[in-house]
């Protein structure tokens, strides 16, 4: 993307506040025109002194214009600051909202810290560009576009000096941009690596401390910082060279203006006041050209991070739904997968031609080896991504024709990892339904067998649970996850084997809460333990993305197929004469002992 396109796209974010932006632009143009008039008036003051004429009138006009310029500059600075701050926060919030709608696979591939770093650095760069655009860039362009014609009307010969100076600045800027483009992109990559390392080590600080990795991780950060310096310094060298060349050109131009002016005055071809005006023009032009050079430096520096941000914005924009999309209402829970196919890009994994039907209130257990496609089915149900072929219908409605918001409102999920926020207990439960009353929150906690342990905490329901629930035990975290699902009270329930990671005693305590939660709801269980599937109305055995077997527990157990093999491998005897089989390699189903069996 060219530098001009990057700049233009950055400015488009200001269109949300069109009136305020136009006001700032008009004010900036006025400031530029007033600034341009100052050297002319100052030259007239000097000429009046030289001619011993009326000094008061031009001096008063010059002072009045200067006072207006000061007030206008304050107005522009104040308005530009406020507008730029508002838009930075606005863009950050809008982009954040789109980011958290992206599928989990997208975040896993990109990296959470990478997306966060891109967002923060890009919005900071946008803020700087917006602020400088309203404060300086626009006034600089207007001043330069007006200054040369005005100067040419006064004296063509002296104007050539200013034109040559402008050409030199442009040539130096183009040279440096060409030399630093790749280097600045490399700098941005090193910034990401450094930030990712910091984020990674801090999020795993317990491992760092436990394994005495503090010194080694700090040294690794030093190495990343050194690599960043090594990439940054060549870029800085080019800009330092540009600054020196620009300063040399501007100084030489001032000398030429003074020499030519003195020569023309002695020859009677120019007045002293006109020479003073041209000196003011030269100083003004040098200042504006320096601002342009700084602007180019800022834009080139921001180029890589803004390009990455725009790519991220384009990727997330594809997830936006039309405003008039229909909602899914009055869900009963009849679910049909009709020849559903989805394959992950460049992976060869997915689900293929999967068909089954679930009646309202039925429980479906999904089992199979790791990577079989169990979670993919659930993600398709929740429209984390849409099928490449086939369709998924809820109560006869294709899920692609309804809003994701209404679809997910109809589905409550209890993950194996509870996924708690660093907020109070009540706030975490209220994730299920934001407008729930205190009484409803407490009722959900009681139904999840969580009320007693919550009251035992020092601050009860106001107790903060720590990052990802670190201040709670595994059982306590899961009970809060179940409580928020109860509070959501959705007709469709997804259980990612919510108790499989718990000890037997804690699991038994939660079983009743889970059973109560799934009662009279269409329930999907991603099963990691065979004991979970016994009461399921429908068992789906997935392998390599295909639905290999489906039926009730007893039907599949007696069929003698893959599911039956899995039962034997887990230690369950269908018949006394059948020997115990080894565990199926790659299976996600955890064997459990049979009562009375010898281990």
Curated annotation (Swiss-Prot):
UniProt keyword annotations, A-Z: ATP-binding, Cell inner membrane, Cell membrane, Membrane, Nucleotide-binding, Sugar transport, Translocase, Transmembrane, Transmembrane helix, Transport
Binding-site list for ATP: 368-375
Residue span(s) of domain ABC transporter: 335-569
Domain ABC transmembrane type-1: residue ranges: 21-301
CDD domains reported in the protein's UniProt record: ABC_6TM_NdvA_beta-glucan_exporter_like
Gene Ontology cellular component terms for the protein in this record: plasma membrane
InterPro entries: AAA+_ATPase (IPR003593), ABC1_TM_dom (IPR011527), ABC1_TM_sf (IPR036640), ABC_transporter-like_ATP-bd (IPR003439), ABC_transporter-like_CS (IPR017871), NdvA (IPR005896), P-loop_NTPase (IPR027417), Type_1_exporter (IPR039421)
Presence of the UniProt keyword Glycosyltransferase in the record: no
Superkingdom of this protein's organism: Bacteria
One GO molecular-function entry: ATP hydrolysis activity
Reactions catalysed according to its record: [(1->2)-beta-D-glucosyl](n)(in) + ATP + H2O = [(1->2)-beta-D-glucosyl](n)(out) + ADP + phosphate + H(+)
UniProt keyword annotation of Cytoplasm present: no
Membrane topology: Multi-pass membrane protein
A matching Pfam family: ABC_tran
E.C. numbers: 7.5.2.3
Bilayer-spanning residue ranges: 22-42, 55-75, 156-176, 248-268, 276-296
Compartments in which it is found: Cell inner membrane
Quaternary structure (record): Homodimer.
Function: Involved in beta-(1-->2)glucan export. Transmembrane domains (TMD) form a pore in the inner membrane and the ATP-binding domain (NBD) is responsible for energy generation.
PANTHER family associated with the record: ATP-BINDING CASSETTE SUB-FAMILY B, ATP-BINDING CASSETTE SUB-FAMILY B MEMBER 6
Record text about domains: In NdvA the ATP-binding domain (NBD) and the transmembrane domain (TMD) are fused.
Protein family: Belongs to the ABC transporter superfamily. Beta-(1-->2)glucan exporter (TC 3.A.1.108.1) family.
Descriptive protein name: Beta-(1-->2)glucan export ATP-binding/permease protein NdvA
Lineage: Bacteria, Pseudomonadati, Pseudomonadota, Alphaproteobacteria, Hyphomicrobiales
Designated gene of the protein: ndvA
